[in-house]
Each structure stands twice: as structure tokens, then as C-alpha cells.
Amino acid sequence: MNQTDLKHKLSAPFDFNEWKNILAQMFPKIDYLAKETSVDNNLVKNGGQIGVIHLNDGRSLGLFKFEVADNIHISRNRKGLREIAAKYVDQDIINGALVLYYSGIQTEYRLTFVSKQTVFDSEGNLSIKETAPKRYTFLLGESEPCTTAANRLIELINKNKRGSVYLDDVTEAFSVERLNKDFFNGYKTQYKRFVDTLTNTKQHRDYVKKLLGRLVFLQFLQKKGWMGVPASSTKWENGDKNYFAKLVEKYLDNNRLLSDVLEPLFFGVLNTKPEEREALFIKKGWNISLLTEFEGIPYLNGGLFEPDNIDNLTIDFPYSYFKELMDFFAIYNFTIDENDPEDSEVGIDPEMLGHIFENLLEDNKDKGAFYTPKEIVQYMCRQSVIQYLKTHEPSEQYAEAIEQLINDGIVNPILQNKNIAIRFTRLLKEVKVCDPAIGSGAFPMGILYVLYHAIHHLHSHAEPHGNFNSTQTKRDIIQNNIFGVDIEQGAVDIARLRFWLALVVDAEEPQPLPNLDYKITCGNSLLSRYPIDAPIENVFVEYNKGKKENEKMTLAKYKELVSAVSYTHLTLPTILRV
């Protein structure tokens, strides 16, 4: 079996008989159980452990297969899959496991590697402590590219032919870090091609960064299915997940693709409300017929698509540049659900927007801009919330319970009391977190997920009869708990977009979104107009000088204004309304 054959098999609907053949070529020995274990769970129709994989280093992997319930959306319901793994996989393995999740009614399925290793102490002796399970997943099936998966799994097949498949080889095959490195290296090559066409001034480099950043972001949006939504649809669904590649193909050899098609899309559609699009197209002299083609595309309230001075440049690139860029993107699986250090899809997640920005930021070392590994971000965010809770609930009886809740997602019996669960939930909802140098949003995104998971874990105890609303909880945290400042406008734009993607990941259609203009702003947090100990009521003294009484700003009026713009509706184009 070569890589092309394997990719074809991975892109087909799930067939376990086919997978038995693939697994036999990947691993030296597999013992299938005479009787498969079965589970009883509302998340699973049937399945359990079906065998044991033996590796050449003497280690073994459990082999599991689950047919998930119809309400589990395989391509984006990682939470439900985590719950299955936590209950039926994580506790029964030593070195790791391979898990196949599939559905009889969905085209996608998942191959997940669960890594769980014993820890050695400083003297090299085996410790009884084991690492927390980490999950790495390939999303496969008819609508997925499967290029990376085929490339990685063929490596295991070739190593098996040489008789040397070790646990480290399996871990490497599912490595997200390696994928990110490969993607970024390829991205830099694409970036350099565009820049080299111009004069390589800072202005032109900034232009290319923003152009490519816009196109990367739209890869995530089309993955959600919100690009090219059919005109007959009354909901945001069934969009074309290959929309941009087809758009570029449609305008074959058009060397004015940027001016004629992409700029009207960026500024006239993505940055303009549906009812205002036609007037803007006429004013700009854009091809009015494009409006019909772009009807199934939402209006975004993010700064990435607002035209700025750099967009006044008259620039075009050869058609081949955009065609090769789309071909490059097509190699990778884009996932809008941000990866967690302990649960990662082997694909490009929204953090890559920040990674690209930080690595292409000129003089980034002089500006103090460095990429912080996600594990460190997660640790710092968890510790910050732990210390906050311990400060407000200093009783020693809660110390261990707080750490278990934030670090492990375990609700200690002491926190299961309804009144106590309500009290801790209120504390989590009231905390204010400000990052004075937000960069592309790594730390605030980390805080978002720490608060979200803690509130989620406490919910069944604080509100035993209430339904947990995932999207609303995230929206409330973003709106009420998180603030940030950065001197780079590009960083602010990326951070806002990452929060936006965090909301849409669970949404069935665009909902009113928080307006983040007053939450994540561009500015220099090292400079201040006000003494650090000045009463907050005095911050408008300078602003109010010389103004009439009815023009003066007060803290109450400011809060009222912020509240008035706190939500901005994303509306369906007129043709999509019932």
C-alpha cells in the first residue's frame, strides 16, 4: 500500500474491515478479543475494547472502537468524545490506546491516539504516578483532506516493514507540534513569494501579512460551513467547505483576482451588513453580479476585514500565487476548536493565527513578542484562577478542592453542596482578568477555557435541574471577565478573531456577538493619563474640561454606552431570510 492508496482509503466512509487491513500493515502484532467489550452509555450505540496492539519495544496499546450516538457530531463534538474516552479508555490502559469513533449517519470519523505513560523519578526508577491521558486525533472521511494522516500513517507502515514500530513512533505520527512546524514553514514560503513580487518595504510586508492572515482566517470559517451557504437555506448550514479553492478556480488565470474578486469580498461583504452591500459595490465600482455569488456569506464584526490605509495601495498578484496558496491550504485540516495540551486534533487550529502573527512580527524580540508554549500558558492560567479562588475562599478546607476543580476537572464532595457550588460559580463569573500585553490572545484564551470548564463542572451541582448553555457561557465570560490591551493593532485583531471563533465553534448559526471594542483595545499599557491611585470617578476630569454639562462624561454614562454596543448582530443575507 502506498501513500496515495492509503489517502484514498482514509477519505472513504468508515469501514472496519478496511481498517483491520490498515492496522495489520501499521503494527507488528494485534490480538483481537474473542468477545468485544460493550458499554452502556447514552453517548455510545455500541463498542468498547476490541483488541491489543503489540509494539516492537515491548509496549502495547489498547484498541477500541465506538459507534457514537446520533446526537454526537463527530467533526466538532470533542467534548462528547472526551467523555467516552475518560470513562471507557483512560482508566484501562498503561501505555496508550488507539480509538476509532464513527457514526452510521455521518461522513466523518476519528482516529484518536491516547497517550498515557508512567513517570520515572530523578534516579530513573519507575514511579507509580502516571501522566494524565493526552489525546491526539485525525479527522477522517469523505469531506476531509486526509493528506497529513496518510503521510503520517504510511510512515508507521514503512517502519513496520523494517520491524521497528515503537511507542515513540506512534507518538510522532500524531504530533501536532510537527504539523504546526510544517505548516508554518510552508506558509513562510508562500509569504515570501508574495512579498518578493513587491518592493519588500515594511509597508508592503505588512500588506502581505494582512492579506494572507485574512485568507487563513477564512479557511476556518469555511470549515464551519458558513461560506457559500445555498440561497435556498433558511439556516447557516450546508456551506461549501472547499469554497475558496472553487472560487479561485472559477476565475482561472485572472491576474486581477485580488482587485476584482477578493477585495469586494473582504470589504464589501465580510465587512458590510447585507442591506448596505449593494450601495457600497456601486460606490466602489465593483462588479455588482458578485453580490449574487457572495449571498451565502455572513457579515463579520471583526477588525481583520476593515479597510485601512494599507489597503489603499493598488496591488495585484499573479493568479498562480493564489492557486498555489489554495493548494497549500488544501493539504491541511483546519479545525475551529482550539486545541488543548491534553486533547489535540492533528490539524491547524485558530492558535495558528497568533503563531503566524508573532513569528512574522518584525523586531519581535525588541518588542518583547515571543511565542509561549500552550502548556505554559495553561499552567499560568490555572494557577492564576486557583490563587484567585483561594484568596476569596481562604479556608484550608477548600484548598485541595479548588486545585482538583481547576487542574483536573474534579468536583470534590465539599463543592457538590448546592450553596457552595453556587458560591464558587459566582466567584468564577465575577473575576476580572486583564492582560496588559495581550499579543494574539494566548493568555486570555487560556483564561476563557479555564473559567468555562470550571463553571461547566460546577453547573450540575449549582443548578441541578438547569441546562448548560455552552455558547452563552463562553459569551458571558468574554463579555464580562476578560480585558486586554496591546500596542499592535494586528495583535488586537487576531485576539478578537480567536474569541469570535471560540463562540462559533458550538453555534448552529451566527448569534449576537460581543462587541469587543471596549474589551480588547489597542494602546500602550506602559503609559497612563491617570495616577495609579486616582479614584475611578476622576478618570473623565480631563475629558470633561470645556464641555457643556450635557456633554460631560460620567462613569455611569460610560457604562451605559458600553452596554448599548455590547452586542452586534450577525444577520443572514436577505435572500436567506424566511
Stretch-by-stretch model annotation:
Residues 2-22, 29-30, 35-53, 71, ...:
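Preference for the N-terminal adenyl/adenosyl cofactor-binding alpha/beta module
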Residues 231, 393-420, 451-480, 503-518:
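Flexible phosphate/Mg2+-sensing switch loops adjacent to catalytic phosphate-binding sites
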Residues 479-482, 516-533:
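P-loop NTPase motor core
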